[in-house]
Amino acid sequence: MNEESPRALSRELVLLLCVLALMVMLALTALFSRLYHKKVHTLADAMFAQGEADERAAQQLAGQAQAAHFKLALTDYRNALAYNPTNPLFQFHLARALAAAGRDDEARSYLLNLLSESPGSGEINLELARIAARNNTMADAMRYYQGAIYSEWASDPIAMRWQVRRELCETLLNRGQVKQAAPEVIALAQNTPADDAVRLTIVAQLLLRTQQWNRALEAYRTLLAGDPNAEDCLAGAGQAAFELGQYVTAMQFFDRLPRERREQPDLLNLFDMTRRILVADPFLSGLSAEVRAQRAANALALVQTRVENCARQTGQSLEQTPPRTDLQRVYQQSRELQQDWTPRYLERFPDRLDAAMAYVFSVENAAAAACGEPQSDDRALWLLGRSRSVVNR
């Protein structure tokens, strides 16, 4: 009994030592594993940070220098993913860099995988929208843009959704898709505070580009209430009023601009045409009967020349009996009524001025249909007629 007891104790001791040794080895393994993974993640984060720096540098450059930095960013992001292959942030930045480098197919593949895992990501939807727009697949672009607008954003979601919708508007307008852009611009305007002058200015410009003249004029009036001398707002308001046929209002805005601004290419023709229209318009308030009659007589003389020139241009005989074309019909009408539309007659019978000017407008319309839109003073009369038809409708 006494001889076997030490042997039993030594077996227990050996077992205990083995267990302790195993625990120490497991602890060391866990420690080294943590140190390894920490080192790997540190390397991955360093590679990712370098990729971000290269990407930011590329965005500030152009040409070959930009391409070189995007190439460096791609290498950095790929290296980061080699150390941390499941990191979605690394994958997203790699996809964005691929897209910036023109490698849309590769970028789309990464982004679609990410979208399947995070369908509510605004950033992923936006990048997919941009790729689709670049490749002229506008149905997909619209879908992804809408997804980005109504998706989640990590910070300041209201501002990001506004920016995305603005980008959608610009994308459509740059492709000439004015009708498709119009409702998006309206939605953008509805989400723009009236006291945010910077954003409201952008909206007003987009309203002009989508030919929503009333909304544009309203937006510019709001802006001018805060800054009455803002030149771009005065110019935009003048253009909107001009397109609405509100020529007196347009001139009021143009007159508030410095002469140098009115003479710039974007306004010179508008200002000149507004002036011509107001000089020719016999319906302006405050004019004497004599001036109204003289303006109407001048318009009648002008359209007489217009109809004759247009007939020569199109090879029509104005003596055709019976008249067959609109141009021939308005010419025959002038021969019948010309003697009743002298300045003295129109001054004596001012109620006949409406009929005389209606004839002027019918001549300009007939000539425009036969020979194209008029220029100079004829264009002034043509536009005046169009604006009055809208008012009287």
Task: List PLM regions with ranges.
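N-terminal leader/linker segments that initiate helical-solenoid repeat arrays
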Residues: N2-Y83, P88-L89, R386-N392
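Canonical tetratricopeptide repeat
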Residues: H93, E127, M160-Q163, E167, ...
